[in-house]
């Protein structure tokens, strides 16, 4: 009886812990994460204080923090080739990182670190030197900065069959030396690394290449982590938020369902299908059943995005900043529709897959610069600073915890819907105008369209819609309008 009771208690504790790992620990009504890809720590700290906090962003996903290999030309992917767990990269050192986390937490913006638990660096001719000056011999699986040696890795093999679980989880992903997460030593070093980040005040982790690690091994690692730091404002017993990179197109041998109980999972099908729709390959009317109706994960288990730092560089349906009108429309729908844990992308300009972040002649990452409108101008794209995107972050905050209602469509790619009695979105992805009296569900009054402008000193700088006593308003979105979307909410009422 005692053994049975103990087993039940352990199961309940484990279940509670994994459920807690789905909680992103947002402040108030905030509920959007931004990925400030390759930004420096001091620039992120300033952005939290000057822009993200004031505009209601909930958190930042930051690039990998651990020491990485130095590759010729400094491509972005060198950050995904660890040399040690020292917190020194081109984004800054441990002191810079700790200062950034503290300053962002102070203004209600949480930090989530992209962590590399699957592997170390790939082959390198001779001795490699990392960003903290640590030497390693990746070809010999020798990483004295941790330290790891050959016995801490799976035997080298190439992934040639993506339907072979053994290859996917024990061979080398694009030649990266594959750690053995079942090893007590490897587990201890990974837990030590993550716990140190928790001590510094982070709210959670994006786990890179999660599908290439056995779910049981990850479960052990996650459950062994410390609670979040109360010194950084987290409540007692708060668990780190976990979201895991698992690419699953629905026919994978290693599936997302093996990981979604451990934490949230990146819902790549969301990205692909929203790109298809707003590129015109699917009528928007079908988005009424968006989310689980499309076979996606349950809302609280799905990390959703229009694009990420990987797939924005690939050919195909995925939208990126290079198709700005469609990208802004897709992002508006993403942030308005009540599904998923939302993350928006903040990129730098690229011409090919390997393009480095903006850097100077000494290969130091440069800080973003802004024009009079607040947009980035020196190689950083900063989609999160586009009015049409940060305004939708505010929309998402204003309508939090409301249901979708009053879906309307024209039988093709003009749609609208309400979020309770707090918000309304209309989209026109047809080649002809949308001109229609539509149910907005809003109280009577005049509302500013937060896509084309904003509410300033009691008046609208862009379009406005007058809502009558029955909740109806006349909506016009021309086919050649700069933006193909209109958004109203209660915090933008004149």
UniProtKB/Swiss-Prot annotation:
Subcellular location: Secreted
Listed name of the protein: Alpha-amylase-related protein
Gene Ontology molecular function, alphabetical: alpha-amylase activity; metal ion binding
Pfam families cross-referenced by the UniProt entry: Alpha-amylase, Alpha-amylase_C
EC assignment: 3.2.1.1
Annotated family: Belongs to the glycosyl hydrolase 13 family.
A GO CC annotation given for this chain: extracellular region
Disulfide bridge map: 48-104, 157-171, 376-382, 418-441, 448-460
Residues modified to Pyrrolidone carboxylic acid: 21
CDD domains: AmyAc_bac_euk_AmyA
Binding site residues for Ca(2+): 118, 169, 178, 212
Keywords for the protein's UniProt record, in alphabetical order: Calcium, Carbohydrate metabolism, Chloride, Disulfide bond, Glycosidase, Hydrolase, Metal-binding, Pyrrolidone carboxylic acid, Secreted, Signal
Catalysed reactions, as listed in the record: Endohydrolysis of (1->4)-alpha-D-glucosidic linkages in polysaccharides containing three or more (1->4)-alpha-linked D-glucose units
Biological processes, Gene Ontology terms: carbohydrate metabolic process
Enzyme class: hydrolase
Top-rank taxon, per record: Eukaryota
Co-factor note (free text): Binds 1 Ca(2+) ion per subunit. Binds 1 Cl(-) ion per subunit.
Active-site residues (renumbered): 208, 245
Subunit note: Monomer.
Named cofactor requirement(s): Ca(2+); chloride
InterPro entries: A-amylase/branching_C, A-amylase_C, Alpha_amylase, Glyco_hydro_13_cat_dom, Glyco_hydro_b, Glycoside_hydrolase_SF
Encoding gene, per UniProt annotation: Amyrel
Keyword Hydrolase included in the entry's annotation: yes
Signal peptide (UniProt feature, chain positions): 1-20
């Amino acid at each position: 009886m005692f053994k049975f009771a103990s087993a039940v208690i352990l199961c309940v504790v484990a279940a509670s812990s994994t459920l807690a790992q789905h909680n992103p620990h947002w402040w108030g009504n905030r509920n959007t994460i931004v990925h400030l890809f390759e930004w420096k720590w001091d620039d992120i700290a300033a952005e939290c204080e000057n822009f993200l906090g004031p505009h209601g962003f909930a958190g930042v996903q930051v690039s990998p923090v651990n020491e990485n290999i130095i590759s010729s030309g400094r491509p972005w992917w060198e950050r995904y080739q660890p040399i040690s767990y020292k917190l020194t990269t081109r984004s800054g050192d441990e002191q810079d990182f700790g200062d950034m986390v503290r300053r962002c937490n102070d203004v209600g913006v949480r930090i989530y670190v992209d962590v590399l638990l699957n592997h170390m660096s790939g082959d390198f001719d001779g001795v490699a030197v990392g960003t903290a000056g640590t030497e390693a011999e990746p070809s010999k699986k020798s990483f004295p900065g941790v330290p790891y040696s050959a016995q801490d890795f799976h035997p080298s093999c190439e992934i040639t069959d993506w339907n072979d679980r053994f290859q996917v989880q024990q061979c080398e992903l694009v030649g990266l030396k594959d750690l053995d997460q079942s090893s007590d030593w490897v587990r201890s070093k990974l837990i030590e690394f993550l716990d140190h980040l928790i001590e510094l005040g982070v709210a959670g982790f994006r786990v890179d290449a999660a599908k290439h690690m056995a779910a049981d091994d990850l479960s052990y690692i996650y459950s062994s982590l410390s609670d979040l730091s109360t010194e950084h404002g987290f409540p007692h017993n708060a668990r780190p938020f976990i979201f895991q990179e698992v690419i699953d197109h629905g026919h994978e041998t290693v599936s997302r369902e093996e990981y979604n109980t451990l934490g949230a999972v990146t819902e790549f099908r969301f990205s692909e299908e929203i790109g298809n729709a707003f590129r015109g390959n699917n009528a928007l009317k079908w988005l009424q059943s968006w989310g689980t109706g499309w076979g996606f994960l349950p809302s609280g288990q799905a990390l959703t995005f229009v694009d990420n730092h990987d797939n924005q560089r690939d050919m195909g349906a995925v939208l990126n900043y290079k198709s700005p009108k469609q990208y802004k429309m897709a992002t508006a729908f993403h942030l308005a529709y009540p599904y998923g844990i939302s993350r928006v992308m903040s990129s730098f300009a690229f011409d090919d897959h390997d393009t480095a972040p903006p850097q100077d002649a000494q290969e130091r990452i440069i800080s973003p610069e802004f024009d009079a409108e607040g947009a980035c101008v020196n190689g950083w794209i900063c989609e999160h600073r586009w009015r049409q995107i940060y305004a939708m972050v505010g929309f998402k905050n204003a309508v939090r915890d409301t249901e979708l209602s009053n879906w309307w469509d024209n039988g093709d790619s003009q749609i609208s819907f309400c979020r309770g009695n707090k918000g309304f979105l209309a989209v026109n992805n047809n080649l002809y105008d949308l001109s229609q009296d539509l149910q907005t569900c809003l109280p009577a009054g005049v509302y500013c369209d937060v896509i084309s402008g904003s509410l300033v000193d009691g008046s609208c700088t862009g379009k406005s819609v007058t809502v009558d006593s029955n909740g109806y308003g006349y909506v016009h979105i021309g086919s050649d309008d700069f933006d193909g979307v209109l958004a109203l909410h209660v915090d933008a009422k004149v």
